[in-house]
Amino acid sequence: MMSFVSLLLVGILFHATQAEQLTKCEVFRELKDLKDYGGVSLPEWVCTAFHTSGYDTQAIVQNNDSTEYGLFQINNKIWCKDDQNPHSSNICNISCDKFLDDDLTDDIMCVKKILDKVGINYWLAHKALCSEKLDQWLCEKL
């Protein structure tokens, strides 16, 4: 019985430390430090994150010669470093796997660098889907 309880606790703790699928309101709260940064509103960020990763902090997209990581799909050729692309510019000075957890602090720091260097158009979903009719991306439960 004791080993079953121990195994159950390990399973619970393991799940608690894993990345997760966030809700709209969780993303809204987590991204508060991005509000109006670079002229981009919080609803625009929530919309962009949804259309970029589906709010999945573990999202990984393999392209022909690069990989994109996390909630914001940050690319390993320029912004972060991984084993696939060890000669990355690594402008954010970070390992790409840091974008795969539910601590968005490092993601937000890199997003700000991306905004400063290339602007919001880095995220193709923004212009196409997140520049108008943003009321649906608000969270009433703050």
From Swiss-Prot:
Glycans are attached at residues 64, 93. InterPro entries: Glyco_hydro_22, Glyco_hydro_22_CS, Lactalbumin, Lysozyme-like_dom_sf. Keywords: Antibiotic, Antimicrobial, Calcium, Disulfide bond, Glycoprotein, Lactose biosynthesis, Metal-binding, Milk protein, Secreted, Signal. GO terms for molecular function: calcium ion binding; lactose synthase activity; lysozyme activity. GO terms for cellular component: extracellular region. The keyword Disulfide bond applies. It comes from the Eukaryota. Changing residue 96 to G: In allele C, allele D and allele E. Ca(2+) binds at residues 98, 101, 103, 106-107. Mammary gland specific. Secreted in milk. It is found in: Secreted. GO terms for biological process: defense response to Gram-negative bacterium; defense response to Gram-positive bacterium; lactose biosynthetic process. Regulatory subunit of lactose synthase, changes the substrate specificity of galactosyltransferase in the mammary gland making glucose a good acceptor substrate for this enzyme. This enables LS to synthesize lactose, the major carbohydrate component of milk. In other tissues, galactosyltransferase transfers galactose onto the N-acetylglucosamine of the oligosaccharide chains in glycoproteins. In vitro digestion with trypsin produces a peptide comprising residues Ile-78 to Lys-98 which has antibacterial activity. It is active against Gram-negative bacterium E.coli (MIC=150 ug/ml) and against Gram-positive bacterium S.aureus (MIC=250 ug/ml). Belongs to the glycosyl hydrolase 22 family. This is Alpha-lactalbumin. It comes from Bubalus bubalis.
